[in-house]
From Swiss-Prot:
Residues 42-71 form a coiled coil. InterPro entries: Matrin/U1-C_Znf_C2H2, Matrin/U1-like-C_Znf_C2H2, OCRE, U1-CZ_Znf_C2H2, WBP4, ZOP1_OCRE. Keywords: Coiled coil, DNA-binding, Metal-binding, mRNA processing, mRNA splicing, Nucleus, RNA-binding, RNA-mediated gene silencing, Spliceosome, Zinc, Zinc-finger. Residues 155-172 have a biased composition (Low complexity). Nucleic acid-binding protein that promotes Pol IV-dependent small interfering RNA (siRNA) accumulation, DNA methylation and transcriptional silencing. May possess both RNA-directed DNA methylation (RdDM)-dependent and -independent roles in transcriptional silencing. Acts as a pre-mRNA splicing factor that associates with several typical components of the splicing machinery as well as with Pol II. It comes from Arabidopsis thaliana (Mouse-ear cress). Component of a pre-mRNA splicing complex. Interacts with STA1. Interacts with PRP31. One of its GO terms (biological process) is gene silencing by siRNA-directed DNA methylation. This is Zinc finger protein ZOP1. GO terms for molecular function: double-stranded DNA binding; double-stranded RNA binding; zinc ion binding.
Length: 242
């Protein structure tokens, strides 16, 4: 039988970072030693410092988050207040009535009940009875005065025919006819119209013709004669029997 010698392993100390003999006596002596106790105290001190630094960092981050949330809340509330002010400035006036309507053509709000116009940019009011832009108190005072005099605030549209008296429908049968009947009739003109036109042409004075116009008229007349001479044999072609 063959016997083998096996060496005894050592023990590693995590605090001192050294190897010691792996037996109870060596381990006890090492644990009771001054160096080991100092290393253990240092390790515990480092652990406490790291824990305190971690707690401090957590508290710092928590405080920073609270500041960010508070700043975001203030900014949000400020934005809401600004939006409400803008909506109030650009919206209809808050006078307890809901009769205001936005006129897209002019960009002003109009109240059909009292006839006032409101400009949301400046906050002024306009009325036909006043004739210029005024504040809210002056506008409603004018409306109250106008309502007391029983004068309509909204002007009635004036007809295009002017301010003359209205003409009623004439009695009897209504016959519609054109103002110029000759122009509406289609067809050949009458002999009377032809005679009048011919008389007008005869009464007109002859215009002076230049030499160039005379040459052009002469050339056109010669061309017309040539065309007539060329087409004379063809006249009556379709009247010949086959």
């Amino acid at each position: 039988m063959t016997e083998y010698w096996v060496s005894q392993g050592n023990k590693w100390c995590e605090f001192c970072k050294i190897w010691i003999q792996n037996n109870p006596t060596s381990i006890r002596n090492h644990d009771l030693g001054k160096r080991h106790r100092e290393c253990v105290d240092k390790k515990l001190t480092d652990m406490r410092e790291r824990s305190a630094a971690k707690d401090k960092e957590l508290k710092k981050n928590e405080k920073l988050l609270q500041q960010i949330e508070a700043k975001a809340t203030r900014s949000y509330q400020k934005d809401i207040a600004t939006a409400q002010q803008v909506a109030k400035a650009n919206g209809a006036p808050e006078d307890g009535t809901s009769d205001w309507m936005l006129d897209s053509a002019s960009g002003y709000y109009y109240n059909q009940t009292n006839g006032l116009h409101y400009d949301s940019q400046s906050g002024f009011y306009y009325s036909d009875s006043i004739g210029h832009w005024v504040t809210q108190d002056e506008a409603y005072a004018a409306v109250k005065t106008s309502s007391g005099t029983k004068v309509p605030l909204v002007k009635k549209p004036v007809s295009s025919s002017g301010a003359g008296p209205s003409v009623g429908k004439p009695p009897g049968r209504l016959v519609t006819a054109s103002l110029n009947p000759k122009r509406a009739v289609k067809g050949a003109a009458s002999s009377v119209d032809l005679g009048n036109n011919k008389r007008k042409r005869q009464d007109e004075k002859p215009k002076k013709v230049s030499a160039e116009e005379k040459a052009a008229l002469k050339a056109r007349e010669a061309a017309r004669k040539r065309v007539e001479d060329r087409e004379k044999p063809l006249l009556g072609l379709y009247n010949r029997p086959f």
